[in-house]
């Protein structure tokens, strides 16, 4: 059943107008101009939607009714650590949150345990299912990767809780340090595209380009840098790309890293396609990336967690992924959709 969301349209239109009017805001990063930083804002190297595109999308918006709540079957408690360097274990938490364990290191991507993805509980996207790992069962986290600062990927309340239990290193794009000032936490490092950080004698993380955007309000559009992460560990390269559209930058990633043991790719929030294709990949795009990067395995994320004014059904990603896998002749067991809380292991 389709539902026209009038209140969403009005609020979104007002927000967009204010974004255009108030072009100056807090500066989260000050540095020299580059191919992706100009006039105090970060930019994509490929076309974005225009203001008129946004208005057209808002005018045409039709949301699809989702279930108010989905109960998932309980999964085993995650391991405290995976000590072996020839084993990689990944556990899907929810949305873009993935627990990555190998060589005695626990890495967590874009963690969110909050009930709502937004500035306040009554103005954001509501959760429709519980995280796959209960917070009190989360192992000690060594590194947190933040792909960008949208509310569904950078959740301050969750970060505060993890800092209180684990004191992890937080890695993100340029501007993330100032963005997290409210935490009063000093173990944060910001990276430019292609900048590297070595976290162990055998482990290295590289911040890589993506095609997306950033911002949390009316005055900070694209003031911080978005991107993905390549985790280089003995078992092989792992790509966590966060939120992204399909783009030419994947060719650059392929040239630099050649091959991947695992790619973690978004496969949700992709309709209406004419508008979302410059922000979010769909399952067809994700399978193409799987093939382009010579990935041994891939894993889909960013689906069916928050009701974000979705314009596709709650299970559309599963159906469309099956179609794409058949289209590109990729075996279904090479591209996973894990249950919330489900873990898988890869060995060298």
Predicted features, each with a name:
Residues 111-113, 149, 175, 210-212, ...:
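Active-site metal-binding loops of divalent metal-dependent hydrolases
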Residues 47, 122-172, 187, 258-264:
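Active-site metal-binding motif and surrounding structural segment of the metallo-beta-lactamase
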Residues 97-101, 199-260, 277, 281-285:
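Catalytic core of the metallo-beta-lactamase
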Residues 100, 110, 148, 155, ...:
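Divalent metal-coordination and catalytic microenvironments
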Residues 157-162, 183-184, 249-253:
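A short acidic, amphipathic alpha-helical/loop segment
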């Amino acid at each position: 059943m389709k539902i026209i969301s009038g209140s969403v349209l009005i609020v979104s239109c007002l927000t967009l107008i204010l974004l255009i009017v108030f072009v100056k805001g807090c500066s989260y990063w000050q540095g020299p101009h580059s191919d992706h930083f100009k006039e105090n804002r970060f930019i994509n190297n490929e076309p974005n939607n225009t203001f008129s595109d946004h208005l057209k999308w808002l005018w045409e918006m039709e949301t699809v009714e989702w279930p108010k709540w989905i109960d998932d079957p309980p999964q085993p408690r995650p391991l405290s650590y995976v000590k072996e360097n020839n084993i990689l274990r990944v556990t899907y938490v929810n949305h873009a949150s993935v627990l990555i364990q190998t060589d005695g290191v626990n890495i967590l991507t874009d963690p969110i345990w909050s009930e709502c993805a937004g500035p306040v509980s009554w103005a954001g996207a509501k959760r429709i299912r519980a995280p796959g790992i209960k917070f009190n069962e989360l192992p000690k986290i060594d590194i947190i990767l933040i792909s960008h600062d949208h509310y569904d990927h950078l959740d301050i309340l969750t970060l505060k809780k993890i800092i209180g239990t684990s004191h992890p290193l937080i890695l993100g794009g340029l501007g993330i340090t100032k963005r997290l000032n409210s935490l009063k936490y000093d173990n944060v490092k910001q990276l430019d595209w292609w900048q590297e950080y070595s976290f162990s004698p055998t482990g290295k993380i590289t911040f890589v380009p993506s095609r997306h955007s950033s911002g949390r309000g009316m005055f900070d559009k694209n003031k911080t840098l978005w991107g993905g992460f390549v985790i280089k560990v003995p078992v092989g390269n792992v790509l966590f790309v966060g939120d992204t559209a399909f783009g030419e930058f994947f060719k650059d990633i392929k040239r630099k890293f050649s091959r991947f043991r695992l790619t973690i790719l978004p496969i949700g929030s992709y309709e209406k396609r004419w508008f979302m294709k410059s922000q979010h990949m769909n399952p067809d795009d994700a399978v193409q990336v799987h093939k382009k990067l010579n990935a041994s395995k891939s894993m889909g994320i960013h689906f069916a967690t928050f009701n974000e004014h979705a314009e596709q059904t709650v299970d559309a990603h599963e159906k469309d992924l099956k179609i794409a896998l058949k289209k590109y002749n990729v075996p279904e067991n090479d591209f996973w959709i894990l249950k919330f809380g489900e873990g898988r292991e890869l060995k060298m």
